[in-house]
């Protein structure tokens, strides 16, 4: 037995010497015909260690994503969707229930006139529907017992922020990565949740706690879809524009100061608007998208936490579901409190804090809610978001002026408490003590 073992070891050593050539860096190129999807690419490198017992692997993943402003996307003469789906022989779509009620006939007519079969799942997408069960429902539709989508077949998603999150997450899970095209029917979906790579569903009392990074291959922004949005939803979406104005674009901030309320009243220049306001609406959308994507698109997998677009989203993920606030109002409270905190830290002056709060209140967004007085809740929120951001710091985006920001690595409990007290004192002098219009989910029938 001993001789047999010795012989085997000797043979192995000879094979190693004869056949194994140590190469410190091995890469493989793949022929284009083997590529899984036209939107995704990847390369890798393997480095073998001379001891013959370990390897080091590094890999890169490349994706292509586009954001496009389009007018009247469901007009049968508009080629955008037809060019995507005609050659594929069908369109598989997940459509928000309300969108289906408003635009379902136009959607079906579009594909009928362009001679493209349409297979659609109509899905209710309230905040209360942002659950793993909804994701599973969409997966059943996309999977083998449903439409059996291909790994290179872009699913069409049409809806607001909730649907973009849950349907996008379903696409990330189907075949481990199925592409999708996003048409945002709300302002939140059009300029924030839609083009975002963060697909998700809610966790237990923590908003967006479960998810994956999977951006759409194309985001279509059609301002004419905002015509049918209730004003409460228009206002809700404005918070995502204001956050970029405060942290990144002073011109956008001034446009919002001057035209913000008119954009709410005219449903983003779709009703009783003149040509000037239409141009302003397009400029506001473009600037908000550009500010958002120049930070999001260059940090697509959130590998760094210097993210201005997280302004207003440090404490709100914890208190929003507890207070049952509309997302935009929770962000409004978060932004206004963040401005007061920045004032307390000496990052901005009082006039700048007041301008930020005044912009929010001018369009009816909330800037204060008693929920932030719950110190335990706020500190738990900090703990949760710190873990979510990698535990190296809190990295809360806070304004350093109008159109610029810095990132607070830590907010000690005593500073948090004093900032809340100062913010409460300041907001007590505001109309309604800082409460916004239609600030709760129940106000818009979403509960």
Language model features: what each stretch is:
Residues 11-42, 51-56, 239-242, 348-447:
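C-terminal charged capping/lid subdomain of soluble metabolic enzymes
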Residues 145-185:
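A short, small-residue-rich loop immediately preceding and capping a beta-strand
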Residues 169-265:
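A glycine/threonine-rich phosphate-anchoring loop and its flanking beta-alpha core
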Residues 264-377:
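Active-site segments that bind and position negatively charged phosphate/pyrophosphate groups
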Residues 218, 224-225, 231, 239-251, ...:
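Generic secondary-structure signature for well-ordered alpha-helical cores
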Residues 2-154:
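ATP/NTP phosphate-donor binding region
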Residues 94, 119-121, 156, 181-183, ...:
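Hydrophobic/aromatic beta-strand patches that form the interior of the parallel beta-sheet core
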